[in-house]
Regions:
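Secreted/processed peptides and extracellular or luminal domains of membrane proteins
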Residues: 44, 48-51, 273, 291, ...
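Short, charged low-complexity linear segments at domain edges
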Residues: 7-27, 247-254, 290-307
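Cys/His/Pro-rich metal-binding microdomains
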Residues: 43-46, 268, 320-323
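Radical SAM enzyme [4Fe-4S]-AdoMet core and its adjacent flexible, acidic
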Residues: 1, 93, 97, 124-269, ...
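Soluble, non-transmembrane catalytic domains of enzymes that act on hydrophobic metabolites at membranes
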Residues: 29-56, 60, 71-77, 166-174, ...
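Conserved alpha-helical substructure of the radical SAM core
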Residues: 3-121, 125, 333-335, 344-345
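Flexible mid-to-C-terminal extensions adjoining Fe-S/redox cofactors in radical SAM and related proteins
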Residues: 13-14, 264, 281-345
Length: 345
């Protein structure tokens, strides 16, 4: 009974978010790149690193928090976020129902310390996502020699923090597609809360990295979903089953997007979703170019500018399409047409 009540409350909260957004649209999802510094140059990374990073100060980020703060999702990005020494203070500036921080796992001590500090103030809301792209040889080739073992140690230590949700992100590309199913079973046995499969996107540092063929992705899909169904996603009862269904809906939506070369579910980029980069530039999503900077204008001026409106109009007209997980999440959850599938009907 208690689990059913928790599930019902969660569903009602999500439905309330959707209704409020439809009545009065507002930004509920912020991707905040806290640093452009990274200790790796992963072969499949799409981030355009600056030679001389000029990261936002804590005061400048506080200005962002003062203008956009009542969030469902706060996604921290980079660079390698844990290289920012005041990361915990940055997170403290925001009110968010769910906080997600990715890491390449290279610094187990530093990551575990900051995760523990943030989790203590945000119990049940923090997810630490560690990147693992394949077994050791594959992962180290795609990222950096020795990175597999360090990421593995980071996962082990994070799992020792009671109540902290730990996730693995895996970029799916030709290089790891041959071992992906066995690797997914390996990750499941690590005891993490779940694994996200991210289709390669953007313009990788190494242009030889590409997506597997559509036939390969279709063949892998059912077996992948069967493995993902073994996770509880850090949840219980009804909402756990919804999250399992979501993985299947997301995968099918992404494949159809690639096949049709258009948006399958209308994209809310620039409407519910905003990206602030470490240098202050602002974009409607990580795929499209920036259209302003908080170092030149207050954030609200950027978000109400003619340039921003033009970018959003282009998204609404389906002038662009992508498989970006961060976008697909809100697109699916805020589209009532997906609810029958999410509920398993």
């Amino acid at each position: 009974m208690a689990i059913q009540q928790v599930g019902a409350r969660t569903v009602l909260k999500v439905l309330g978010d959707v209704v409020r957004y439809r009545i009065s649209p507002s930004f509920r999802h912020l991707i905040l790149h806290v640093t452009n510094i990274c200790n790796m140059r992963c072969q499949h990374c799409f981030v355009d690193f600056e030679e001389k990073p000029n990261d936002l100060s804590l005061e400048e980020i506080a200005g962002v928090a003062g203008e956009i703060n009542d969030l469902i999702w706060l996604d921290i990005g980079g660079g390698e976020p844990c290289l920012r020494k005041d990361l915990a203070e940055v997170v403290d500036l925001f009110r968010a129902r769910e906080i997600s921080i990715p890491t390449n796992g290279w610094f187990p001590d530093r990551i575990t310390k900051v995760a523990g500090a943030i989790h203590e103030k945000n119990p049940g809301r923090l997810i630490i996502t560690v990147s693992l792209d394949g077994f050791e040889a594959t992962h180290d080739e795609m990222r950096q020699k020795g990175s597999f073992q360090r990421a593995h140690e980071t996962i082990r230590r994070l799992r020792e923090i009671p109540g902290l949700r730990v996730k693995v992100n895996t970029v799916v590309c030709e290089r790891n597609s041959g071992e992906i199913l066995d690797f997914m079973r390996y990750v499941r046995d690590l005891g993490v809360d779940y694994q996200s499969l991210l289709l390669l996107r953007g313009n990788p540092i190494n242009p030889l990295y590409r997506l597997p063929s559509m036939d390969s992705l279709r063949r892998l899909g059912e077996a992948m979903q069967h493995i993902l169904d073994g996770y509880d996603f850090g949840r219980k009862g009804f909402f756990r089953s919804v999250l399992r269904n979501y993985q299947a809906v997301k995968w099918e939506t992404q494949l159809q997007t690639l096949e049709r070369e258009t948006q399958v579910v209308p994209c809310l980029g620039g409407q519910i979703h905003v990206v602030v980069y470490a240098n202050g530039e602002v974009a409607p999503c990580e795929i499209l170019p920036p259209v302003g900077s908080i170092r030149k204008s207050p954030l609200k001026e950027v978000l109400t500018s003619a340039e921003w409106k033009d970018a959003v109009d282009g998204i609404r007209r389906k002038a662009c399409h992508c498989t970006h997980d961060c976008n697909q999440q809100e697109n699916i959850l805020f589209d009532p047409r997906t609810y029958s599938k999410l509920l398993g009907f």
